[in-house]
Amino acid sequence: MPQTRSQAQATISFPKRKLSRALNKAKNSSDAKLEPTNVQTVTCSPRVKALPLSPRKRLGDDNLCNTPHLPPCSPPKQGKKENGPPHSHTLKGRRLVFDNQLTIKSPSKRELAKVHQNKILSSVRKSQEITTNSEQRCPLKKESACVRLFKQEGTCYQQAKLVLNTAVPDRLPAREREMDVIRNFLREHICGKKAGSLYLSGAPGTGKTACLSRILQDLKKELKGFKTIMLNCMSLRTAQAVFPAIAQEICQEEVSRPAGKDMMRKLEKHMTAEKGPMIVLVLDEMDQLDSKGQDVLYTLFEWPWLSNSHLVLIGIANTLDLTDRILPRLQAREKCKPQLLNFPPYTRNQIVTILQDRLNQVSRDQVLDNAAVQFCARKVSAVSGDVRKALDVCRRAIEIVESDVKSQTILKPLSECKSPSEPLIPKRVGLIHISQVISEVDGNRMTLSQEGAQDSFPLQQKILVCSLMLLIRQLKIKEVTLGKLYEAYSKVCRKQQVAAVDQSECLSLSGLLEARGILGLKRNKETRLTKVFFKIEEKEIEHALKDKALIGNILATGLP
């Protein structure tokens, strides 16, 4: 059995050698006949390396010499490894040939890349020199036209809108007197280490918070040795929550437990410490701290007058007579009475000065016409004197003009655009745009739909508005609580035999009227104590509702 296996192995490789000998004999027909011993020597001779196997499997000079002389028969399959020579590795051979080709061609590629890069640099330099000498080239015209298509007049409008925002500006014209009073008060008490209290009152949008914020920012750079704490009381859930908020700002740590005697004692000890810094406590929307017995407000106004106190209290609210009407006990104690400073509504000339000062920061060519600015100031000063409203109206008018200009510019063909050398004159905001915005904001919100269509104002909301109007006339006050309003509303519904909604739905109706801009709400932790007031003139409401039969009857008969 071993002999048969060895013979079988010899017969497998024998035809390959026989095939190579036959080919060699065909080429060398003039040679003598070889003996069987010579056959074995031929197989071991160096000529076997030059036998015409597949050229792709040969390496070195043998491959170059024998590549043209292809064998007449088909070469062995390349995928099988056993067909090759004993020590030949096809993958290694292919990789060596490929690497040699790379090493031969890589220097030329690098040189070509350098030459190509030098050509590009030279062309860029030439193009730069040409553009400096001649500015009217076709590529430049196309680029400028594409840029002008989207940025023709948008930059000036965006800059104007940025300066007309309601943030605290660097300059506050028309409030020099009030700012001098606040600045002198703070310098006197901070530099003199003297406690005190100041109450700022005025309608919304008259610059109370803006003036105080600007002065405090300036004093931080000028004076040292004081700490500022600013709290907006609208963010507090209850009036008692102001004490944990103050303790958190002073101690720089969270206070989880509710305000009690221990916390009050801790705050008073911190404010009366001998080596402690001066504390400037600013409470915005201070009238939201209204509580039973006004204990919170009395405690806050008594803190500056404790022995060795270094607290400077500044309260800000819309109510003019807060200290007189809500805190009458402060009148009995003269030293606890705060210094009062009222911010009157802005006049027409002051609003014009503020708007022009903002617009002059952008460019000399104003986006708004002078007549449009005068018209906006006159309308706003006649209603409320709120400068924030004037800024919003102007910004909205600029947005309308900007949208019109962008739509026209985008739809204009590229060939119709003016040349870049011609100056671009932006479209200015005129009286028409200001009037359009004011009619949207301050127009007749009570106007109903025309041509016999269904009213856009629901019946329950109209009855609630009539009840509020009659209640204000009867009590001769401007604000009523939601509880009293609901009682009057229920009486009117019973008299007119109309189904009334419950108190929670009455609050929802008030919220819808607030969204329309008809009512204003001063919310409280207790729903019945939420204050309701009109945001538009009563004559306008009466004129819009008196034509209807049911509403006219309610207004004529009054409250039952």
Curated annotation (Swiss-Prot):
Q: Which Gene3D superfamilies match?
A: 1.10.8.60, P-loop containing nucleotide triphosphate hydrolases, Winged helix-like DNA-binding domain superfamily/Winged helix DNA-binding domain
Subcellular localization is given as: Nucleus; Cytoplasm
Biased composition, Polar residues: where in the chain? 1-12, 35-44
Q: Motif Cy: where?
A: 93-100
Q: List the disulfide bonds.
A: none
Keyword match Cell division? yes
**Residue segments, region Disordered:** 1-91
Provide the positions where the record notes the PTM Phosphoserine.
45, 54, 74, 106, 127, 419
The cross-references to InterPro entries, in alphabetical order and at most eight, read: AAA+_ATPase, AAA_16, Cdc6/18, Cdc6_C, Cdc6_ORC1-like_ATPase_lid, ORC1/CDC6, P-loop_NTPase, WH-like_DNA-bd_sf
List positions binding ATP: 202-209
Q: Which Pfam families is this protein grouped with?
A: AAA_16 (PF13191), Cdc6-ORC-like_ATPase_lid (PF22606), Cdc6_C (PF09079)
One example GO MF annotation: DNA replication origin binding
Residue(s) carrying Phosphothreonine: 67
Entry-linked SMART domains? AAA, Cdc6_C
Could you provide one GO biological process annotation from this protein's UniProt record?
A: positive regulation of cytokinesis
Q: What is its main location?
A: nucleus
In terms of domain of life, where is this protein from?
Answer: Eukaryota
Is the keyword ATP-binding in the record? yes
Annotated Gene Ontology cellular components are: cytoplasm; cytosol; intercellular bridge; mitotic spindle; nucleoplasm; nucleus; spindle midzone; spindle pole
Q: Write out the entry's keywords from A to Z.
A: ATP-binding, Cell cycle, Cell division, Cytoplasm, Disease variant, DNA replication, Dwarfism, Mitosis, Nucleotide-binding, Nucleus, Phosphoprotein, Ubl conjugation
The record's family statement is: Belongs to the CDC6/cdc18 family.
Disease implication from the record: Meier-Gorlin syndrome 5: A syndrome characterized by bilateral microtia, aplasia/hypoplasia of the patellae, and severe intrauterine and postnatal growth retardation with short stature and poor weight gain. Additional clinical findings include anomalies of cranial sutures, microcephaly, apparently low-set and simple ears, microstomia, full lips, highly arched or cleft palate, micrognathia, genitourinary tract anomalies, and various skeletal anomalies.
Checking PANTHER family in the record gives:
CELL DIVISION CONTROL PROTEIN 6 HOMOLOG, CELL DIVISION CONTROL PROTEIN 6-RELATED
Self-association state and partner proteins as the record states: Interacts with PCNA, ORC1, cyclin-CDK. Interacts with HUWE1. Interacts with ANKRD17. Interacts with GRWD1; origin binding of GRWD1 is dependent on CDC6. Interacts with CDT1; are mutually dependent on one another for loading MCM complexes onto chromatin. Interacts with TTC4. Interacts (via Cy motif) with CCNF; the interaction takes place during G2 and M phase. Interacts with CDH1.
Q: What name is this protein filed under? A: Cell division control protein 6 homolog
UniProt source species: Homo sapiens
